[in-house]
């Protein structure tokens, strides 16, 4: 089976230190992949393969963490290190602690923005965080999100430091079966068929530079009966003059193409 690639354009010493700070929590059964975890290079693959950009920065790794009373202030001192993106209850997080509905989990880390990204908008992406999330950059609240399974992102450009390092803080509340959210079989007291809760960041966190006008999402629909591929590019801001171009490649060979304006989907006839 051939793999087809779609290209779109919008016209307008750490490893040693990390290993010393982290080890799996508890005496849990481990797979061969768990044995291979490197805290300085956790899940290094690009986290959004359906819409991949060349420039990005992975923020997975060791973060500071603290467990606080719900509604409490961000602490000045943190309890230790947690390996993102593993849930705080898990062994691979290096923490292995349970959190109740009267507590919140706070994360902190610093990051630098590559100088080559100057003049770009900087997006902060979360693959998934369970459940209610609040995010600050340099003490500026950049956004909130509710939901444990869906990705979300914030434009953090206005909050970034003009020079030097930036401070990222994430606060999470997850009441599990004592709240209103969908939770599957997660319960506060797991037994029988019920599961241990998953709290906090559990998918990749990353930074991405984009232009002022950019593609936010793609909706790709194949029609096998008619040999058509429909591509809907959702832009951060629509304008009638925006031109979206779709190129379909078989390896390095261009096999189909199409264009649209006015926010219309592109229908590409496939060979």
Show which residues each predicted segment covers.
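Accessory beta-strand-rich segments of carbohydrate-active enzymes
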Residues: 66-68, 97-215, 238-240, 245, ...
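N-terminal pre-domain segments of enzymes
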Residues: 21-56
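Bacterial Sec-dependent N-terminal signal peptides
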Residues: 1-22
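Short, solvent-exposed beta-strand/turn "edge" segments of beta-rich domains on protein surfaces
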Residues: 53-54, 98-102, 221-224
């Amino acid at each position: 089976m051939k793999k087809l690639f779609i290209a779109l354009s919008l016209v307008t010493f750490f490893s040693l230190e990390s290993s010393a700070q982290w080890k799996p929590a508890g005496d849990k059964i481990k797979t061969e992949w768990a044995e291979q975890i490197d805290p300085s290079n956790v899940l290094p693959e690009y986290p959004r393969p359906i819409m991949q950009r060349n420039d990005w920065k992975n923020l997975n790794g060791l973060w500071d963490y603290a467990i606080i009373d719900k509604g409490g202030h961000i602490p000045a001192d943190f309890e230790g290190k947690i390996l993102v993106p593993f849930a705080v209850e898990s062994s691979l997080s290096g923490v292995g602690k349970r959190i109740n509905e009267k507590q919140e989990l706070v994360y902190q880390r610093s990051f630098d923005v590559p100088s080559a990204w100057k003049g770009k908008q900087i997006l902060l992406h979360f693959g998934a965080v369970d459940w209610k999330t609040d995010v600050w950059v340099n003490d500026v609240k950049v956004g909130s999100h509710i939901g444990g399974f869906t990705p979300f992102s914030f434009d953090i450009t206005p909050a970034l430091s003009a020079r030097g390092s930036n401070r990222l803080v994430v606060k999470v509340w997850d009441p599990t079966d004592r709240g209103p959210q969908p939770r599957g079989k997660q319960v506060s007291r797991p037994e029988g068929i019920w599961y241990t809760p998953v709290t906090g960041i559990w998918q990749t966190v990353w930074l991405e530079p984009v232009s002022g006008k950019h593609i936010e999402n793609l909706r790709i629909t194949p029609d096998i009966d008619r040999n058509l591929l429909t591509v809907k590019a959702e832009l951060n801001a629509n304008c009638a003059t925006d031109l979206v171009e779709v190129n379909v490649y078989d390896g390095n060979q261009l096999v189909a193409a199409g264009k649209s304006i006015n926010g219309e989907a592109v229908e590409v006839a496939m060979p």
